[in-house]
């Protein structure tokens, strides 16, 4: 890890980790006093982190402007995501490049979108009302969440 590599190089190192903020504070004791250095740790890029970057406002707008029905399933979003959010989708494919073929990566991306909808349902003004079976982005019939707009 980054911390252990740093400790190997600087044996007199005090490391404090603040889990609420994504950085480490390294305090090094060289021969002439203490030096503090902050190292920012980037969040791992995943489909979920890309959705967080896209933001609730964009997804809320998408749901309310592109889905006419009061109820919809997650596949209604995931199946059109590659076309409607092409840049995000391509970044997601790259982020999960080592996780199998395109069908597997599509399943991972769709799963992360579903998780994101669940975690952010209040901000997106939707509520999960059950499960249904429908056609996914790989053309397979699979279970998915059913949502209702507020």
Identify the residue ranges that each predicted region occupies.
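Flexible coil/turn residues that form the inter-helical turn or adjacent wing/linker of helix-turn-helix
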Residues: 70
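Cationic, low-complexity basic patches in intrinsically disordered or flexible, solvent-exposed regions
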Residues: 8-9
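Long, compositionally biased intrinsically disordered regions
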Residues: 23, 30-37
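The alpha-helix within a helix-turn-helix
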Residues: 78
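Phospho-regulated, low-complexity intrinsically disordered regions of nuclear gene-regulatory
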Residues: 38-65, 75, 83, 87, ...
